[in-house]
Amino acid sequence: MLAAEEANPLIPDVWEMLITGIGFVILLFIAIKYIVPAFEKVFKDRADAIEGGLAKAKAAQAEAKAARDEYNQQLESARLEAQKIREEARSEGEKILADFKDRANMESARITENAHKAIEAERAAAVVSLRDEVGTLATQLASKIVGESLNDDDRANRVVDRFLADLDAEQGRTGAAR
């Protein structure tokens, strides 16, 4: 009996188990009522923050993509506008060059026309001068050959004019014969 009276050290006393169980239930109640909701709230806040961060990151990424697309569109628009400006400048340059060429051609034609007029005027002046000189020389020569004085100007002019008319007629016949 001695062995029966002695309690097994591995089996606890019933009252100890009961008090320990009640303490455990109270601690469990306090943990479930106050501690677990606090942890749940912290976990929920952290999850919301992470999800919000992900949403913000997605929004920022979408915004960055939209900004990049807008930038690319503006860049393409700027390229097209630059190309248009280059084409307009090239066209304007060609117009200016054509205008300068037209002006140069007109100026060249004007200078050529003036030169022809000047040459024609000089030729006419030379013809008149040569006629006068030829007339004077012919008169002097004729008066020496004929022995008749041609000092009368009207008479000398008639002789010279007749001589030059005969000369022109002879040139016309030789020119037509050629």
Curated annotation (Swiss-Prot):
UniProt GO MF annotations: proton-transporting ATP synthase activity, rotational mechanism; proton-transporting ATPase activity, rotational mechanism
Localization (cell): Cell membrane
Residues annotated as transmembrane: 19-39
Lineage per the UniProt record: Bacteria, Bacillati, Actinomycetota, Actinomycetes, Micrococcales
Function: F(1)F(0) ATP synthase produces ATP from ADP in the presence of a proton or sodium gradient. F-type ATPases consist of two structural domains, F(1) containing the extramembraneous catalytic core and F(0) containing the membrane proton channel, linked together by a central stalk and a peripheral stalk. During catalysis, ATP synthesis in the catalytic domain of F(1) is coupled via a rotary mechanism of the central stalk subunits to proton translocation. Component of the F(0) channel, it forms part of the peripheral stalk, linking F(1) to F(0).
Subunit structure: F-type ATPases have 2 components, F(1) - the catalytic core - and F(0) - the membrane proton channel. F(1) has five subunits: alpha(3), beta(3), gamma(1), delta(1), epsilon(1). F(0) has three main subunits: a(1), b(2) and c(10-14). The alpha and beta chains form an alternating ring which encloses part of the gamma chain. F(1) is attached to F(0) by a central stalk formed by the gamma and epsilon chains, while a peripheral stalk is formed by the delta and b chains.
Keyword field: ATP synthesis, Cell membrane, CF(0), Hydrogen ion transport, Ion transport, Membrane, Transmembrane, Transmembrane helix, Transport
GO cellular component: plasma membrane; proton-transporting ATP synthase complex
Membrane disposition: Single-pass membrane protein
Top-rank taxon, per record: Bacteria
Encoding gene per record: atpF
NCBIfam families, per the entry: ATP_synt_b, PRK05759.1-3
InterPro entries in UniProt: ATP_synth_B-like_membr_sf, ATP_synth_b/b'su_bac/chlpt, ATP_synth_F0_bsu_bac, ATP_synthase_B_chain
Family that this chain belongs to: Belongs to the ATPase B chain family.
Species whose genome carries this gene: Kocuria rhizophila (strain ATCC 9341 / DSM 348 / NBRC 103217 / DC2201)
Cross-referenced CDD domains: ATP-synt_Fo_b
The protein, known as: ATP synthase subunit b
